[in-house]
Design a protein with these regions (language model features):
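Non-catalytic N-terminal regions of enzymes
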Residues: 1-143, 191-195, 202-215
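Flexible, P/S/T/G-rich "lid" or insertion loops adjacent to the active sites of thioester-utilizing
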Residues: 146-199
Length: 215
């Protein structure tokens, strides 16, 4: 599959920066709890007779110290051991997900729930199960575990007459080199700008990114 190619980024990432250095021991304990709550994410990629499939991992992965560039390519044998990884650098915790596990919303819910459990264990804080934080001791609902493609795709036949997808232009970097652009924006100003345009913050950022790519 495409995920095996070194020039293809097979992971995406969500990170959070706290005000104190991360306690990796507590984070490992919080990850154990969170991984049990998300059986559809705590998985590894396995090869079947005809196709690949996802299988629950028998053991939660170890917390890794981040020593290289974010989103380093994951060799396929690593994905077959565990399809996500948790990395720590000083007071930042990041979770990198194999692209087939979930979308950005599901990944954000996982990270927020992990942080809620971490804060609970580390500081005794009671973080309610709301606003993207799931109850850590609850079992996953049937809706979380189902393959929703069949429900929403239905019996609509696939069309071969699809328009060509947009392709980025430019010269690719060699040897997996990545250029990272980091910026900090005051949340209140960002929300005010989104409100001015009648859109959500997510829609505003996506539109800005697409405009930047197009230009």
């Amino acid at each position: 599959p495409a995920a095996k190619r070194r020039n293809w980024n097979n992971f995406f990432r969500i990170s959070a920066t706290l005000t104190e250095p991360i306690d990796t021991g507590v984070l490992a304990s919080a990850l154990d709890v969170t991984a049990r709550r998300f059986p559809s994410i705590a998985v590894r990629l396995r090869r079947g007779v005809f196709w690949y499939y996802l299988e629950e991992i028998p053991k939660t992965p170890s917390i890794q110290q981040e020593k290289s560039c974010p989103l380093a390519h994951a060799p396929f044998h690593e994905v077959r051991q565990c399809a996500f990884r948790v990395l720590v650098y000083k007071n930042r915790v990041a979770v990198e997900f194999f692209h087939a596990l979930t979308d950005g919303t599901g990944a954000l819910v996982f990270v927020k729930t992990l942080l809620a459990e971490y804060l609970s264990e580390k500081y005794g804080l009671s973080v309610p199960a709301e606003k993207g934080v799931l109850g850590r001791l609850e079992e996953a609902s049937p809706e979380e575990l189902e393959d929703s493609f069949a429900r929403y795709a239905g019996d609509v036949p696939a069309s071969r007459a699809e328009s060509t997808a947009y392709h980025l232009s430019g010269t690719p970097e060699r040897d997996g080199y990545k250029n990272l652009v980091t910026m900090m924006i005051p949340a209140e100003k960002l929300r005010a700008c989104a409100k001015e345009h009648g859109v959500s913050v997510t829609e505003l950022l996506c539109a800005a990114m697409m405009q930047a790519i197009g230009e």
